[in-house]
Amino acid sequence: MKIRFLYIALFAVLAISCKDGKNNKSDAKSGATKKWDKTLIYPEETHFKSMQQITFGGDNAEAYWSFDDKQIIFQSNNKNWGMECDQMFLMNVGDTFKDSIPPMISTGLGRTTCAYFLPDNKSYVYGSTHLGGKECPPAPLRREGKYVWPIYDSYDIFVADLEGNITKQLTTEPGYDAEATVSPKGDKIVFTSMRTGDLELFTMNIDGTDVKQITDQLGYDGGAFFSPDGTKLIFRSSRPKTAEEIKEYQDLLKEGLVQPTEMELYICNADGSDLRQLTDLGNANWSPFFHPSGKKILFSSNFEAERGFPFNLYMIDID
């Protein structure tokens, strides 16, 4: 495995150069443009052409491009925007939100996660707990000092337009259904589900039909993305192996929790065949995404961090 270091501390920034090489940015309120602030790029970060900070405050995550590269959808719990837990927001490329608030495009009910544009650029899929209650579900506390994530059984996957109107519910099975992303071919969705009693990957058509199970090994399989040609999937998984690891994983899962601190990357064909482990680095290896060539993977990791932080970006070959 050939690894390449792309040093960057992960805070709420977006590398616009991935899609847009223009050396300017728009003011979200006035529409005026000004030069990129290159002070965000450290001298060692030779792979970045430009970088712009988009959000200021709160937790802002899961930011994904529209198919036409003109807009970005993301989730935020920014209290300055009136949020108690994650909701979905929309922005045009070049917008920043230091002194303004982007339009919210989810219902404002429950908690939401992992939005992704559909090919028409007029609608998107996302996970939401709102059918289980209008309020934000309770956030878990650390267990014995360990960081844990909630796996709310009220999460289902929905389709909505960019005004926030839900147009379709794609999942109805009991338990957690979330983390949906769409194939660049525009024909399939991959998502994580608890419908078998464990957190496995599934695919379906973009209309919710033809659901197929992709993974079937014990562990939290999630955060999956298609390759540019739609033939492969990259994802991260915990895959506990020892009796102690298995017991801890299963005990937490019974409480609707996971501990996402030991995750490695896996790759397989879109039908689940030819599954193989891609990294063996230790700690948390996260957010894998295919390079446009389809031959490399970009991901975030803290494997070199002594105390679990900071996270940095890396690139590896798929072989």
Feature map (PLM): residue ranges:
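C-terminal motif of bacterial Sec signal peptides marking the signal peptidase cleavage site
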Residues: 16-17
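Residue-level detector of Asp-centered blade-edge/turn motifs that repeat once per structural unit
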Residues: 67-68, 119-120, 184-185, 228-229, ...
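Short loop/turn segments that connect beta-strands within beta-propeller blades
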Residues: 93-96, 161-165, 205-209, 269-273, ...
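Predominantly a core beta-strand signature of beta-propeller blades
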Residues: 50-53, 98-103, 147, 165-168, ...
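Hydrophobic beta-strand positions that form the internal "hydrophobic ladder"
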Residues: 72-73, 124, 189, 233, ...
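Blade/loop signatures of beta-propeller domains
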Residues: 29-49, 155
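A flexible loop/linker signature enriched in serine peptidases of the S9 family
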Residues: 56-59, 76-88, 106-112, 127-156, ...
